[in-house]
Every structure is written in structure tokens, then in C-alpha cells.
Amino acid sequence: MTRRKTGSGIRMKERLQKLLSAAGVCSRRAAEGYITAGRVTVNGETALLGQQADPETDDIRVDGVPLGREPEAVYLMLNKPRGYVTTVSDEQGRKTVMDLLTGVSTRVYPVGRLDRDSEGLLLLTNDGALTHRLLHPSHEVSKEYRVTVSGPVEHAAERLSRVRDVVGLPIRPAEVRELSRKGNRAELSVIIHEGRNRQIRRMCAQCGLEVLRLQRVREHCLELGTLPLGQWRYLTAEEIAGLKEE
């Protein structure tokens, strides 16, 4: 802590980690990550780890939002193409879903994941409470996928619906139905209530099926609809209300 004299007395400058924690932004440990990631600025300059500031006289911001003010909640839907990873940044330099959010000035974060080879509906928001609710297993949020597979496709829907574990972890039975079949290819609708890593791909592998295309078309009350591939839109008030319903 540094004491600094001013015309009206002595003010205290404190480490940014402590100030962010005291303002309820995050824990002190998490604040270190915010600072090193360049998410914190002081008087318009990117903050440095260990830097001190005075919240009464310095303009301290996190993700562009002044300290002590809640950012406006933003909710949007992206039709994610293949080839993009579902992260805010990628150490390997791969394309991320954030590269597709042109025109979005508020920092948002993906709710859950779609793997790099999958496509379809991805929800992004800065509403931490809603994110926690949608991802918590106790809420069993349903997600629907269109899955194109090849291999022994006869009775594939029945076989997939009988899978009870992936990589040794128990799962709820998926709701699977055949939409179309021709030769050794089939298009399936698969509804799951969990989000284990590559769950549907691993279920298919157990049944000797190769996944040719995996597209999420619905999550909870949100439907992908006709949103073009690679494009995004803000959620409607009705959609937001539906997500927040218990």
C-alpha cells in the first residue's frame, strides 16, 4: 500500500488485485489472470501485475467497464462453422469463435463448447449466473444435434440410445431417432442432457459409426433456425426469458 499526499489529505493506493477483489469482480488470484491477460486498464493504459492504483482518483476498468459498475448483460447466438475452437484465445494460434463476433463491443464468453470439427448453435454471454445455471449438471439442459454417420447404420438409433457410459463415465440415455438413411449413411437426431467431452462422437465410436457431420440445432429453448453459418445475432427478450426460467 502506498500513501500519496493530495491537496485534501492523504489517499491510499493499493494493488489492483485487492481492489478488484474488494469490488466483487473476482478473487485476488483470478485478478492476477485478468491483469496478465490485459483485461484491466488504469487511466487508459493496460495494467501491469503488481501495479497500484487509487479507486477514487484513477480510472480503473475491467473489460472496458469502470470498476464498481456492472456491465450490461449481453446474450447472443452464433452459428459456429467447423475449424474454429470454442475459446476466447488459443495459444496455438488457431481460429477461435471470437474471430466471428465482428461488431460486438462487449466482452462475452462461450457457454459450454462445440469441438473444432463440430458446428451449429453456440450461446455466448457475459451473464455469469446464467452460464453457471446452464452448465450445472443438476439443471439437465437438453441439447439437440443433427448427426450424419456412416458404417453399420441399421438400428443405429437403437444402439446409440443404449449407450450408458463414455470413457468409463456414466451418462443418461440419449434420445435418438433416425431422420433418414441411404446405403451405409444415416442422419440422426440426438438429444443429450449432459456435456461430456466429445460425448456424441464417443458414443458413435462405441457403435462402430463414423461421424461425418455434427451440428447442434437446439439448446434448451434456443433453436438455430435459419441463422447463416458463421453469423451471429442477439437473442430476443422472449429467448432470454426462456433461458432464465426454472
Name each region found by the language model:
Residues 3-246:
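Basic, flexible Lys/Arg- and Gly-enriched helix-loop patches that mediate nucleic-acid binding at interfaces
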